[in-house]
Design a protein with these regions (language model features):
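Short, conserved secondary-structure transition motifs
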Residues: 111-113, 123, 150-174
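Short, well-ordered alpha-helical segments in soluble proteins
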Residues: 128, 141-145, 165
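A common structural junction motif
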Residues: 98-102, 139-149
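Mixed-charge intrinsically disordered linker/loop segments at interdomain junctions
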Residues: 168-186
Length: 206
């Protein structure tokens, strides 16, 4: 069954990477002035490849504390770390090895053949409404890819669209909380439950 997901989409598209005051305008339109859209993945990919920025987190304001829920999770692959360049085929192989099905990907405004920059999109099978779970999902996904931008984990993160290639891999592609739990790293010592408990405690005001 093909389902729709909720996401903030900037009504204005760009032919090149936004900068300066444009970025502030995008954030205001996305998270303050624009209600979330309910779209199919095909519709979302069409918006992304015509330069529309998106906010995967459903917000009731412009800061991370205003986050309410999220079903779409994005990973930035910027290839800025030392080590081998990670290309789309390599990222897809990592997903396959870990039982994760990315829904779509797209090359960013800054992408070149020599220096690939792209984003992978994952869709949960249901919206996430717990901030601790959101953070754990995001950190698990970014840590899975050696050339990902580890700073792109905040709840109010905005992702710009592109003027380059975007590809829908699986309209019905979804991942579950159990899929995320099954991803393991050699240096990961905390259990999921322990991490969530710690994150929830950290949110309790003094």
């Amino acid at each position: 069954m093909t389902g729709k997901i909720k996401v903030h989409i900037d009504p204005k598209g760009y032919d090149e990477k936004p900068s300066g005051k444009e970025i502030g305008g995008i954030k205001s339109r996305l998270q303050k002035d624009t209600s979330p859209s309910l779209v199919t993945l095909e519709e979302l990919v069409q918006k992304v490849e015509t330069g529309h920025s998106i906010s995967p987190g459903i917000m009731e304001g412009m800061s991370a504390k205003d986050w309410k829920e999220q079903q779409l999770f994005m990973v930035d692959i910027d290839n800025e770390e030392d080590g081998p360049i990670l290309r789309i085929k390599d990222a897809k192989a990592i997903c396959h090895d870990n039982g994760l099905s990315p829904a779509f990907y797209y090359q960013t405004f800054s992408h070149t053949k020599e220096h690939p920059k792209f984003r992978l999109a994952f869709v949960m099978d249901k919206p996430i409404t717990d901030e601790g779970m959101r953070k754990y999902i995001m950190e698990t996904l970014v840590n899975l890819f050696p050339q990902s931008d580890k700073s792109c984990v905040n709840a109010d993160r905005i992702f710009h669209g592109t003027n380059k290639s975007a590809k829908l891999l699986n309209e019905n592609g979804r991942i579950s909380w159990e899929d995320i739990e099954a991803v393991s790293f050699p240096t990961q010592k905390n259990t999921v439950a322990a991490m969530l408990a710690t994150q929830k405690c950290a949110r309790i005001p003094n």
